[in-house]
């Protein structure tokens, strides 16, 4: 297993250490958000996808990435919750990853942005994740999504939301994703 950091990341870590940057736990939530967004440029160029749509619901937002491959009668579906310790992260911090997932999986990728703390304490993000998942799954036919090939995923706090949402769907007796 390769335990070496990529050169750009290693340089960034060295710069942080040399500059005496404070620990994330010592930063304000606003500063953490700004830093997370600023780090998104390290992801490189954005891949072109077939189309992007975005809309706002009551307390959450959804961005749909459509693949640029030929039309499909029923696309696999990925519902993705971004990470950021529940304090930061949004569509822009994860845009490059969503584009890559969309193109490499030839899938519809629904990125979900939930409410963040501290403005919206627990269980706001959890409730948003469940509501968004139910809304997406109910509307899959309009996007040619395959209800039998739905996966919930996320990174960091988003991985937690994917897990908890799956458990809440199961407890409610609702349709479950094929993968999580």
Segments (PLM) and residue ranges:
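A glycine/proline-hinged amphipathic helix-loop "lid/cap" segment
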Residues: 1-67
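A generic structural signal for alpha->beta connector loops
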Residues: 49-51, 59, 106, 147-149, ...
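Short beta-strand element of the alpha/beta-hydrolase
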Residues: 74-84
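A fold-wide structural signal in alpha/beta-hydrolase
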Residues: 77, 106-110
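Conserved HGGG/HGGXW glycine-rich cap/lid loop of the alpha/beta-hydrolase fold
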Residues: 80, 87-103
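Catalytic nucleophile-loop/oxyanion-hole region of alpha/beta-hydrolase
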Residues: 90-91, 97, 110-149
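Primarily recognizes the serine-hydrolase "nucleophile elbow" in alpha/beta-hydrolase
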Residues: 134-143, 147-180
């Amino acid at each position: 297993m390769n335990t070496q950091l990529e050169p750009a990341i290693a340089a960034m870590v060295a710069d942080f250490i040399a500059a005496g940057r404070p620990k994330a736990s010592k930063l304000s939530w606003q500063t953490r958000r700004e830093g997370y967004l600023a780090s998104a440029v390290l992801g490189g160029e954005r891949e072109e996808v077939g189309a992007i749509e975005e809309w706002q619901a009551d307390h959450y937002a959804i961005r749909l990435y459509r693949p640029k491959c030929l039309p499909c009668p029923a696309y696999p579906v990925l519902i993705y919750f971004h990470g950021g310790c529940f304090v930061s992260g949004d569509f822009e911090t994860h845009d490059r990853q969503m584009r890559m997932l969309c193109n490499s999986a030839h899938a519809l990728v629904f990125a979900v942005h939930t409410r963040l703390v501290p403005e919206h304490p627990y269980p706001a993000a959890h409730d948003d994740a469940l509501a968004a998942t139910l809304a997406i799954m109910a509307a899959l036919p309009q996007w040619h999504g395959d209800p039998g090939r739905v996966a919930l995923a996320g990174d960091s706090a988003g991985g937690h939301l994917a897990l908890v949402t799956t458990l809440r769907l199961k407890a409610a007796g609702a349709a479950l994703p094929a993968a999580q």
